[in-house]
Amino acid sequence: MEKTNVQPATGKLGVLCVGLGAVATTFMTGVLMVRKGLAKPIGSMTQYDKIRVGRGAEKKYLHYKDIVPIADLNDIVFGAWDVYPANAYESAINAEVLKEKDINPVKDELEKIVPMKAAFDHNYAKRLDGNNVKDCATRWDMVEALRKDIRDFKEKNGCSRIVVLWAASTEIYVPVC
């Protein structure tokens, strides 16, 4: 069996969400609330649950972070792309998933999360009509613009690594062949 070389989770982790609507803002609000000690990470496998390691007399229960390198919640920096220019606080209020009383304790942090312009084609999400979109001549130009956004976000926020999460609307089926 080939050995893996898992690197430690050091430095800031940039979490970029494609879409800044109900799913993304609920996720962000939850992480920010846990960071402030205002909520427990119930439902978060990596933060709250334990996993059994070993059998019989050797078995013990460890947190995931004690087994694999996982970023500390305090090291996460959020960013997003969205077709609408509203910041994460405005989007969370508009989504009406969480109550305002639950969002307000992290209002300042959410207001700082302003979406970058989305790489968007109206043909794939006909019910969306936002104006916060990239003006690109080709798909390749969109790809290059997104790559630049990621590099710029990483540098601006001092992140050592970036993950991108899909939390956007998906409407249309496009056959591959």
Task: Please annotate each region the language model reported.
Residues M1-C177:
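Metallocofactor- and cofactor-centric catalytic cores in central/energy metabolism, strongly enriched
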